[in-house]
Amino acid sequence: MSSRPLLHVRGRILTGPGRDDEVHDDLWIIDGRISFTRPVSGGNSGGPNEPTVLTGWVLPGLVDAHCHVGLDAGGAVDRPTSERQALTDRDAGTLLIRDAGSPADTRWIDEREDLPRLVRAGRHIARTRRYIRNFAHEIEPGDLAAYVRREARRGDGWVKLVGDWIDRAEGDLTPCWPRWAVEEAIAAAHAEGARVTAHCFAEDSLRDLVEAGIDCVEHATGLTEETIPLFAERGVAIVPTLVNIGTFPRLAAGGEAKYPRWAEHMRRLHARRYETVGAARDAGIPIFAGTDAGGSLAHGLIADEVAELVRAGLPTGEALSAASWGARKWLGRPGLTEGAPADLVIYPEDPRVDVRVLAAPRHVVLRGRVVR
């Protein structure tokens, strides 16, 4: 007999962004997997095989495509802290995390059926003294490709570069790598079967990274009329992390006395953040939801990030897809499909009407068990 309960989920099962054939009235969870066929032994007889009934509007487990488990402002954290981070995300409905760089070994999470699934990018790779202390491998351009190969093998199909950061001599954001180095590094990652993403706040690193074949850019606040068409043409995705970009004025205020050019630059990027994301969306650039939790940001903010995407001009269905159906497809993970692992979130109201519903899940089901 299975240790997982038989569950019957009724209401509006949203298997896609809105077509009639993507909305079902119910599904069953049998041995931890989804079925749209009523089980022979489950029914309304009141017998021992009677399913537990859950009702509401149902989405696949949400995706946070930029989230750092195992990291806080000081660097790597211990297992109990990592566990609390993952549980906070889980209880907010995030059941799939693309961990966009962490110095901690979190492989043990894979053995825990009560914690979200992680897609790791290894450890950040940054230029020497050009990133947050204790976060990254800090290296020089000649070593970049070798470190990328190592992190590609350590991760789950992704590698994370730091594409730009403050240059203390210049007093502003500048690219971290010469063009030849990123070309070698991205080719090395692709040869290992990994995709590459990069932290980029400013404008100047973007063209080299995209023309070198990068797959995704984090934050992407420096997109312009010149680079948006290039991203769209190459199909390069962005993860705007708008809840993080919202902290730019505070960061600017803290660094203004020492780096006034950088502070003013950060304020400009912040001021046009919604316009930038809206223009990217209009151009057809793939956009996915990520909170940048870890470091200095709290975990469990995926509902806030989806709401920010709506403020930036994404229609509600697209914003939901950026954190569910579309994000799962992008990461190669199943949604609400026959036979898929039962990772889903149930809400008391329709999130397609108001994405703020995401902030208050009624139930969270992970691997076929109700965990909230």
Annotated model-derived regions:
Residues 191, 270-350:
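His/Asp/Glu-enriched, well-ordered alpha-helical/loop segment
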Residues 1-45, 58-59, 349-354, 369-370:
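N-terminal metal-binding scaffold of metallo-dependent hydrolase/deaminase domains
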Residues 169-275, 288, 293-296, 313-315, ...:
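Active-site core of metal-dependent hydrolases
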Residues 15, 323-326, 338-372:
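C-terminal cap of metal-dependent C-N hydrolases
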Residues 11, 27, 32, 55, ...:
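Divalent metal-coordination and catalytic microenvironments
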Residues 59, 79-194, 227-229, 234-247, ...:
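Divalent-metal coordination cores built from histidine and acidic residues
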